[in-house]
Each structure stands twice: as C-alpha cells, then as structure tokens.
Swiss-Prot record:
Catalytic activity: L-kynurenine + H2O = anthranilate + L-alanine + H(+); 3-hydroxy-L-kynurenine + H2O = 3-hydroxyanthranilate + L-alanine + H(+)
Subcellular location: Cytoplasm
Main subcellular location of this protein, as a coarse class: cytoplasm
Cofactor(s) the record lists: pyridoxal 5'-phosphate
Chain sites annotated for binding pyridoxal 5'-phosphate: L114, T115, F142, P143, S144, D145, D232, H235, Y257, W286
Entry protein name: Kynureninase
GO terms classed as biological process: 'de novo' NAD biosynthetic process from L-tryptophan; anthranilate metabolic process; L-kynurenine catabolic process; L-tryptophan catabolic process to kynurenine; quinolinate biosynthetic process
Pfam families the record matches: Aminotran_5, KYNU_C
GO cellular component: cytoplasm
Length: 453
C-alpha cells in the first residue's frame, strides 16, 4: 500500500470526525445473514443505487398512515391528525423535490413511475415531422428507456413513413475500446444530424457505468439544433447536484427508491420546463385538473398550470409518504454537504481499490483474475463505482458476487460482468469502505485459488 493511503485507524478517525455521522442512526441497516451472508450482524450495504434503506421515521410515518386509515378511513383524505391529508399528500414533498432538482415548484410533479412518466411526457413533447423525427439515446441505456423510446415513433405512422420509423433512433456508442461516452462525440452526432433530431434523451448518471454526463455542455448544442433535451434522473436525484433550470433541460423523470429511500417501486416524479408547449397533446386525468375545481366533477378539463397539470390519478399515499423522511433529512443536512462527503467516500473507495493487487491496469496481460473500474474519475460520477470482474470472457462475476454476499458486502450485479458498489453518505461509513475493499480482495483471492486446483 502507498503511504498516502488511509489506514484502518484513519478511516475510523474520519468517521468520528464526520459532521454527518449521525445520519446513519436514522436508518435501519440490513442484517448480513438475511442478505445472504454467512454470519449475523449488520451488512455492509453498498447498494443504495438500486434500493435505498428504510429511514426510521419513514417506518413511523407509514404506521401513522395505517392508523389514520384504520380510525378515519375515507375522511383521512380531508381531516388528518398528522396534518398530511391524503388529498394533498404530494404538497409537502414538492418544495423539497423542486430544490433537489434545481427547478421551480410549478415545474415539478410527484406521481406514477419512471417509465410511465416517460411515456406521458414523450406523448406530449415528441412531435415528429417529416423532416425532424429522430431520437438520440445511448445504446447502453437502461432497457426500459430503450424500449419506451423505440415505441414512440411507431405511434406516428400517419406522419412517418415505415423507413423513417425504422431509422428513428440514433444510438450513441462509446469509441472502440472505451466504456463511456465522450462529450465531444455526443456533440458531433448532434451536429451531423442537426436537421433531423427531435429529442435527445440521456441519463444524468448512467446506470451501468456510473458516468455523470456533462449536461451543461450538451444542452446548448441540443437547443442550437432545434431539438428538445430530456433526462432520466433515476441515478441522479439525491446523488449528484441537479440544476435543471440552469442547464435549460426541457423535461426529466426520476424515481425515488434509490438515493431518496422511498421504498421498493415507490412513486416517481417529473419536471417540465416552464413555457414548454405541448401543442395540445396531453394525456389528461382528473388529478391534472385544477385543484380548485377538481372535485366539482366537471366534464371540462381545466389543467393545473405547470407540471402538475400532467398528472393523471391521485397520489399513492403509501409509496409517497416514506419519501418525506429522507427529504427532510437532506434539508437538515444540506445537500452540498452530502455531495462533499460523497466525493470523499467514493474517492476513498476508488483509491483503495486501485491500490489492490487485483486492480487490473489496461497494460496488464489478459486473463488475469481481478477487476477494472469503468466509472469515470471525479467529477464525472456520483457515488457509484462499477467494477468489471475479469476475465470477462470466463463469466466469473456471479461467483465473485456470491462470495462477496457471503462475506457481508451487499453490492449490485449487472450482467454480463459488472459489480456496482455505491457507498451512500446518509448511512455508509469510511470504515465500511475499507472493509468492502478487503472483501472484494478476499472474494477474488478465493477465485484465484480455485483456478489453481
């Protein structure tokens, strides 16, 4: 190990000195054995990029809502002993979410799920013409985004010819031998297709590689060529600084069960830039009607101004209210403080991993047991590091992942060969980072020994 690397004592000291160390006590840390470990005790949970942990106050809030349902039933929509009437359950969330994504409150809605929200907004804002109909998306995008984007040109077969539908998608791919997209290559694709692009759809943070896209550089080019910019912020919100207004993003969607800890398959949300016109193309529902007249049951749809006018159904209480606890905690801590700690936490993980004898440099011979990191260096990432387990062609990742689980480290596997590790500032520690690296090494050492037999 290099002398510049932290020792175990250093990591313990950093945790003790950490001004945010108290937030870990706000969460319920999973049991290692329940997660597949061989021993009892708390797991090292580095999987908040997939599903965040349960906030203790979220448990309390859920129990309170169950009590209201039990004692008040339907009247809980209007009279609520905890001042959270179900009729307005989204209202206390909106200011927090707007601040977190860098938007105005009227530009944010809290509803449905990510892919459904994506379809909702594409229905309104993908308006292809004979000359401008293409959608730019990265080829390695999350499958649900890929499926959703491909489905929309087919809905416009009265406007688009079959050959246009077949060629409606421009797929961004990294350069040969590289794992992530270069900003200059994205800009070149936009320039080369400037007259035919209708929408550019990107993630803020790429789910597989952990790459944070340079939206501030991409957005001006998108608008210069006359296209709209949409973002999938599933891995961005609560993880990295989001500045939707400053970046001039047109629309965006997100989920809340990762870094916002709202629970499995919890509610989603979306953003629509003020002034963005839908040309009368809107999927309407009663919860998008003006709240002042919503319960008049009028046959005439009067949309709420802004993003909330694109809502359809009433807000699900039990997948929304757990979100409040983490949003209030973020407000108390200060998101900029979280980002600063995240840089240190993930930076420490990166440094220790790169010091490992199992870290494989590009110049190392092929066939070596180990890992490479495909996530870009700071600042072009969030908390996640994506490790490709080598050799890729031998598909050793599942075995290594299973060994890690048995030793108490909960990461996230993504086929064919990636293990994602994401230390989350609200409940992970520097000491856990050190132990996580040891477990990765132990798992690879066992694989190495098995190959020698």
């Amino acid at each position: 190990m290099s002398n510049d690397l932290p020792t175990k004592k250093d990591l313990v000291k950093w945790d003790q000195e950490d001004a945010l160390n108290w937030t870990r006590g706000e969460y319920e840390i999973p049991n290692s054995k329940a997660c597949g470990g061989e021993a009892d005790g708390k797991a090292i949970y580095f999987c908040g990029n997939s599903l965040g942990l349960l906030n203790k106050k979220a448990r309390q809030h859920i129990m309170e809502e169950l009590d209201v349902w039990s004692t008040s039933s339907v009247t809980g929509h209007f009279n609520h002993p905890y001042q959270r009437p179900w009729k307005h359950v989204d209202e206390p969330l909106t200011p927090h979410l707007a601040k977190l994504v860098g938007a105005r409150e009227e530009e944010v809605a809290h509803t449905s799920t990510l892919t459904s929200n994506m379809h909702n907004l594409f229905t309104s804002f993908y308006q292809p013409t004979e000359k401008r109909w293409k959608i730019v998306i990265e080829k390695g995008s999350f499958p649900s985004d890929w499926y959703a984007v491909h489905s929309h040109p087919r809905l416009h077969d009265k406007v688009l010819r079959p050959e246009q539908i077949d060629n409606a998608i421009i797929a961004l791919v990294p350069r040969e031998g590289e794992d992530t997209l270069r900003t200059e290559d994205i800009l070149k694709v936009l320039d080369d297709n400037k007259d035919s692009i209708a929408i550019v759809w990107l993630p803020l943070v790429q789910y597989y590689t952990g790459q944070l896209f340079d939206i501030s550089s991409i957005s001006p080019k998108v608008h210069e060529i006359g296209a709209l910019l949409g973002l999938d912020m599933a891995h961005g919100i609560g993880n990295v600084e989001c500045k939707l207004n400053e970046w001039n993003v047109d629309f965006a969607v997100w989920c809340t069960y990762k870094y916002l800890n709202a629970g499995p398959a919890a509610i989603g949300g979306f953003y629509i830039r003020s002034g963005l016109e839908d040309g009368g193309r809107r999927l309407a529902g009663w919860w998008g009607n003006d709240a002042r007249t919503r319960f008049h049951m009028s046959p005439n749809f009067q949309p709420t101004p802004g993003a909330k006018g694109y809502q359809h159904s009433c807000t699900p209480v039990f997948s929304s209210i757990p979100l409040l606890a983490t949003l209030q905690l973020i407000e108390a801590v200060g998101f900029s403080n979280m980002v600063e700690k995240a840089r240190r936490l993930t930076g420490t993980l990166e440094a220790l991993l790169k010091a490992s004898r199992y870290y494989v440099h590009p110049a190392d011979p092929k066939g070596k047991i180990g890992f490479k990191i495909i996530t870009p260096a700071a600042p072009y990432r969030g908390t996640q590091l994506s490790l490709v387990i080598l050799p890729e062609e031998e598909h050793v990742m599942p075995k290594v992942f299973d060994r890690m689980l048995r030793k108490g480290l909960v990461g996230d596997e993504r086929k064919p060969s990636v293990i994602r590790l994401s230390p989350v500032v609200l409940y992970n520690t520097f000491e856990e980072v050190g132990r996580a690296v040891e477990i990765v090494e132990e798992a690879l050492e066992e694989e190495e020994e098995e190959r020698k037999r």
